[in-house]
């Protein structure tokens, strides 16, 4: 099997150079893409940026839908860390770089804390996605493998369109009909199940306005043997309306919801029941990001018992 070849390079010096051409070898040219993603993840993790590391993984999953690949993420990242540690000893990185990557390797090989499932609830404009992102980052800072799964992204994936694609008036009824919504929550269940099986906590970013949708996720958590947490987002109606108008103006977000959608949701949503309230966390999102982050940290400490 030829892994290295001598290539003639047409430059003024008329020299030949030896270059690896592994990528042209049929047996070696292909790699599990989660292995490549694990390289970036590992480097962020090794440089003490766990929140950025898991934010990157969530973005990768939003783009690929490869939640099953999470099973290989930590082993692949550990392998990458081992290679970096070896290279550090052989090169100029020295003891400091070796120590960084060796500690990273040890952390990746250690059994992770027990995962959990966090489900967002709230009408459009209440700040669910912002809270979900803050929660994911906070869980990562607490040393927990974690990914966020967004209903807006998974709905568009099922429809075979880009995350930021917008429906025409004729398409809206199909995209947001009862059948498509059921399929979307089924897809969220599948993605969350894959993440939990890989030892990752999951933050499910969805409206969850019907009790059946919330019970679906609670049942999944029970079947997986993990704790279920319901986080309910609130905001003043006028502020929610302003946010949605601004989001529509800026574009680029997977959510299609506008002010009219929010008003309809307020009319038909199924409030949290007395049974659900026992384990639910209520968040007030008044528009102050720092205050919201403080709330998230405080509620997460309650959930984790720290």
Predicted regions and their residues:
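Small-molecule kinase domains that catalyze NTP-dependent phosphoryl transfer to phosphate-bearing small molecules
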Residues: 246-306
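Conserved lysine of the Walker
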Residues: 128
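Positively charged
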Residues: 1-31
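Active-site activation/catalytic loop segments of kinase-like enzymes and analogous catalytic loops
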Residues: 33-64, 79-93
């Amino acid at each position: 099997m030829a892994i290295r070849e001598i290539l003639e390079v047409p430059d003024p010096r008329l020299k030949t150079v030896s270059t690896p051409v592994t990528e042209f070898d049929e047996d070696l040219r292909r790699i599990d893409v989660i292995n490549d993603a694990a390289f970036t993840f590992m480097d962020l993790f090794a440089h003490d940026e766990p929140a950025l590391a898991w934010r990157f993984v969530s973005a990768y999953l939003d783009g690929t839908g490869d939640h099953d690949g999470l099973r290989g993420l930590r082993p692949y990242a550990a392998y990458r860390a081992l290679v970096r540690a070896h290279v550090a000893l052989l090169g100029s990185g020295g003891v400091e770089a070796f120590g960084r990557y060796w500690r990273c390797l040890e952390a990746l090989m250690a059994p992770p804390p027990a995962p959990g499932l966090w489900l967002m609830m709230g009408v459009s404009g209440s700040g669910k996605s912002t809270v979900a992102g803050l929660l994911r980052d906070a869980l990562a800072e607490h040393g927990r493998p974690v990914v966020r799964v967004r209903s807006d992204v998974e709905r568009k994936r099922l429809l075979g369109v880009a995350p930021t694609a917008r429906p025409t008036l004729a398409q809206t009824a199909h995209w947001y009909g009862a059948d498509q919504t059921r399929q979307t929550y089924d897809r969220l269940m599948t993605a969350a199940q894959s993440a939990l099986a890989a030892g990752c906590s999951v933050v499910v970013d969805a409206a969850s306005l019907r009790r059946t949708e919330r019970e679906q996720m609670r049942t999944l958590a029970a079947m997986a043997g993990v704790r279920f947490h319901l986080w309910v987002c609130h905001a003043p109606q006028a502020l929610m309306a302003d946010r949605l108008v601004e989001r529509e103006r800026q574009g680029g977000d997977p959510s299609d919801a506008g002010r009219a959608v929010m008003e309809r949701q307020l009319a038909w949503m199924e409030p949290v029941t007395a049974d659900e309230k026992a384990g639910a966390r209520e968040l007030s999102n008044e528009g102050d990001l720092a205050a919201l982050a403080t709330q998230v940290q405080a509620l997460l400490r309650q959930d984790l018992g720290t």
